[in-house]
Every structure is written in C-alpha cells, then in structure tokens.
From Swiss-Prot:
The active site is at H472 (proton acceptor). InterPro entries: FAD/NAD-bd_sf, FAD/NAD-binding_dom, FAD/NAD-linked_Rdtase_dimer_sf, Glutathione_Rdtase_euk/bac, GSHR/TRXR-like, Pyr_nuc-diS_OxRdtase, Pyr_nucl-diS_OxRdtase_dimer, Pyr_OxRdtase_I_AS. Catalyzes the reduction of glutathione disulfide (GSSG) to reduced glutathione (GSH). Constitutes the major mechanism to maintain a high GSH:GSSG ratio in the cytosol. Belongs to the class-I pyridine nucleotide-disulfide oxidoreductase family. This is Glutathione reductase. NCBIfam families: gluta_reduc_1, PRK06116.1. One of its GO terms (biological process) is cellular response to oxidative stress. PANTHER family: GLUTATHIONE REDUCTASE. GO terms for cellular component: cytoplasm; cytosol; mitochondrion; nucleus; peroxisome. The gene is GLR1.
Length: 483
C-alpha cells in the first residue's frame, strides 16, 4: 500500500501531466556533443527538432570530461614548464623548482567552472540560432512509443516524433563489491573537489586514470596509481604502454602494479582513508580516492518499453547507420559504446541527420569507424591511429608487416637535466607498406597526430611519408625520415 506521501506525489504527477502530445520531426534524448550536433544539423535542414537534456548542455565532454580535464592538464603541464625556466636562464632569482610549487586549486576551479558555464551558454545560443526547441528534464519512452519528459518544475509533457535519437552517454562504474567503495569518487567527482588533496589514490589503468594521475602529480599532490597489470593503457600499442608506465614511475608517481583494492576504511578522527590492497599492503592517510575503472551506458530512458535491444554489456545495439532494432529509433555515442570519443559522437550525429533530413546525396551517409585517431593527455602526451603491432601481426601475419621504430629525446630537453621521452612507431602492411598503425609518445603528440591522421585515413604508404619534406627542427620530422 502506498504511503500518504507517495499517494500525494502520484496525484501531483497526474494533475500536472499534459494531456496534449506535441509532435516533432526529430526528437533527441541527450544534450551531449553527439545529440547537440545531430539536433542542430537536422534543424538546419528545416526539421522541427526537440532536444531533451537532464542536466547541462554539452554532456560529459563539456561539463566533466574533455574540456575541464584539458584545462587542468594545461595547469599541470605549465607547472612542469615553469620548473624548467631556471635551466633556460630565466628568472634565476626566483625559486621555480618543483619543491617550491604552489597551486591555488579553489581559485582555479572557480575560473574553470566559469569557463564551462560559458560553454553551456554557447551551446544554448547555438541551438536557439538553429531554432531547436530545448527542454530540460528526464526523458522516458512510454509503452505507446512516445516520450514522456518530467521537467524540472515536476510537470510532465508527452512528445511524439517521426524520428527519435537516443544519445544519453555513459557514466562511471563503481566497484560495489569492495567494502567502503562509496568513500571514493569518480572522474565526475574530481571536478567537484574544492581543495587539492595532498595525497590521492587513482584506481585504473585506462586513459582517464592516467590523465588524472598525471594532473595530480604535476600539481604537487602525492599520487598513487593502482593498476591490475604490469602496464597502463593496455588497449594501446605496447610502445605507448611501456613508455608511459616507465616515465610515470621515473617521475615519482607511485604505481602499484598487479594490485587490487580489497577494502577502504575511513578514520573518523582524521577524516583520512586507508586503502587495503590484495598483497596485504595498504596506503594510509589518503585524502581522496578516485575510481576510474571503466564506464557503462547511461540507460533508464525506458528502452524496455519500446523493445530496444541491448548487448551483453547493456549497451544499445546500433548498426552502421545508427539504427536500433526499433524502426525510426536511433542511437550513437557512449550509450552505444563503439568508439567512446566526443568527435566520433559529433560526426555520427551529423551524418545521421544528413541521411534523415538532408539532400539525396546524403541518403547513405554514415560514419566510418575505422582509423579513428585518439590521444591521451598524459605527461607526456600519447596518440594512436589504426591498429597496434600485435593486432597487425594477427591480421596480416608477421611476415607481411614491417615496423619502424624511433626513440629519442626532443630538442627542448637538451637544456634540461630532467628528460621526457619521445617514442614513435609506424606499422606497415603489404608489399606497398601501407601505414596501418601509427603510435606516438612525446610533447605535442595530439597536435602532431591530427595531420597524420588525415594521411592515414587517405591510405598513405611509408613511401608517401618518405616523400614529404621534413620540417626542421621538430620532433614530428622523425615520422617522415624513419628508416
């Protein structure tokens, strides 16, 4: 039997639910990068478009992902660069070594958050410019195939559409089987931290954990990284795995290899955490624990009411054209989980709208998920496009591939006592040595990879690389001069 409170709440919902169903050409559930891009592109073709967002426009990337993460990376990178100034003959009357580093976390957080808020406003204005209707609230399919949205004022509206896109993104996974797991936070929680932790434990060997550990260490926190294997970034080529792992250890990040956390305890007197690991060791007096052990699809939009199929990982199944198994319902981005990168969601969203609402030439438009470049904003940066050396051997056979390697110290570090590694690898296949994989570690890897990504997407061979005149002196010239 319902309590009086629940009965009153249900009555309130019934009283405030709209009896009119509003119809659109296109309804987008999720105001992240992919959803916004698709909505704007559809509206640009004249489609009457509605976008529903539960939290803030921009999704994970703008609010708790790529954008504020990169801002923090800049701060951490600058802290390291400043410590190099004395060796370059600059400010020698000032103590700029790492031991004297100070960082005003609260002030910087305020500036960073203000920047994110400005971006939210820009997203809003861009949607308004394209005449996209925006509703803030929680969307859910009902059994009629329409979408009910519980708005922030607790009123509920019902919408129908010719085409519906689910682009609800993903969310962090917590290890709920570990006692005390709730004493830690996730990458979202990282951006809510009001003070810089003096001692922090980051759990996970993926790119999110590696990036956050690098930021904390660069800004002066005692940083511990707990990983299950011997290396970080195990989904990347071994040259990236080994180079970043070794450099993090060399730089002073406490990397706990072959380790798992079995229990987390809190000292109520000191407010500090004690992290127990499987090897009977522990990390004591920890200020913050950050779980970065993976992400999962953000569901809860009533997909079961319309019969949307999920895979074994509870991700929405979508084909190469972003179609789900339900006619006129589509899905893309992290909720699908093919390639969980913001530019991928944006590109897929735009191509979907091209196909649905654009001119005849776009009737078969779809995103090519092959050779998508990706980078890790570690310290130093790393980037990859194509397949790893191991994958190339499995695909083409060892006798049919050729691998070019180079490891060197960039010129910037010639004046410095502390060095940072640069490591490049080109993986080629077949008699014409088509470049099927490019893996780089070193300063400015993200900027370098963008241009080479175009070449590889176009089917470049090693000879094409060789025929490009080098720009000297740069690190990137090594990629067109390797033998």
């Amino acid at each position: 039997m319902l309590s009086a409170t629940k009965q009153t709440f249900r009555s309130l919902q019934i009283r405030t639910m709209s009896t009119n169903t509003k119809h659109y050409d296109y309804l987008v559930i999720g105001g992240g990068s992919g959803g916004v891009a698709s909505a704007r592109r559809a509206a640009s073709y004249g489609a009457k478009t509605l976008l529903v967002e539960a939290k803030a426009l921009g999704g994970t990337c703008v609010n708790v992902g790529c954008v504020p993460k990169k801002v923090m990376w800049y701060a951490s990178d600058l802290a390291t660069r400043v410590s190099h100034a004395n060796e370059y003959g600059l400010y020698q009357n000032l103590p700029l070594d790492k031991e004297h580093l100070t960082f005003n976390w609260p002030e910087f957080k305020q500036k960073r958050d203000a920047y994110v808020h400005r971006l939210n406003g820009i997203y809003q204005k861009n949607l308004e410019k394209e005449k996209v209707d925006v509703v803030f609230g929680w969307a859910r399919f009902n059994k009629d195939g329409n979408v009910e949205v519980q708005k922030r004022d607790n009123t509920t509206e019902v919408y129908s559409a010719n085409h519906i896109l689910v682009a609800t993104g993903g969310k962090a996974i917590f290890p709920e089987n570990i006692p005390g797991f709730e004493l830690g936070t996730d990458s979202d929680g990282f951006f809510r931290l009001e003070e810089q932790p003096k001692k922090v434990v980051v759990v996970g060997a993926g790119y999110i954990g590696i990036e956050l550990a690098g930021v904390f260490h660069g800004l002066g926190s005692e940083t511990h990284l707990v990983i299950r294997g011997e290396t970080v970034l195990r989904k990347f080529d071994e040259c990236i795995q080994n180079t970043i792992t070794d450099h993090y250890v060399k730089e002073g990040i406490n990397v706990h290899k072959l380790s798992k956390i079995v229990k987390v305890e809190k000292n109520v007197e000191t407010d500090k955490l004690k992290i127990h690991m499987n090897d009977s060791k522990s990390i004591d007096d920890v200020d913050e624990l950050i779980w970065t052990i993976g992400r999962k699809s953000h569901l809860g939009m009533g997909s079961e009411n319309v019969g949307i199929k999920l895979n074994s990982h509870d991700q929405i199944i979508a084909d190469e054209y972003q179609n789900t198994n339900v006619p006129n319902i589509y899905s893309l981005g992290d909720v699908v989980g093919k390639v969980e990168l913001t530019p991928v969601a944006i590109a897929a969203g735009r191509k979907l709208s091209n196909r649905l609402f654009g001119p005849e030439k776009f009737r078969n438009d779809k995103l090519d998920y092959e050779n998508v470049p990706s980078v890790i904003f570690s310290h130093p940066e790393a980037g990859s496009i194509g397949i790893s050396e191991k994958e190339a051997i499995e695909k083409y056979g060892k006798e049919n591939i050729k691998v070019y390697n180079s490891k060197f110290t960039a010129m910037y570090y010639a004046m410095l006592s502390e060095k940072s590694p640069t490591r490049y690898k080109i993986v080629c296949a077949g008699p014409n040595e088509k470049v099927v994989g490019l893996h780089i570690v070193g300063d400015s890897s993200a900027e370098i990879l963008q241009g080479f990504g175009v070449a590889i997407k176009m089917g470049a061979t090693k000879a094409d690389f060789d025929n490009c005149v080098a720009i000297h002196p740069t690190s990137a010239e090594e990629l067109v001069t390797m033998r």
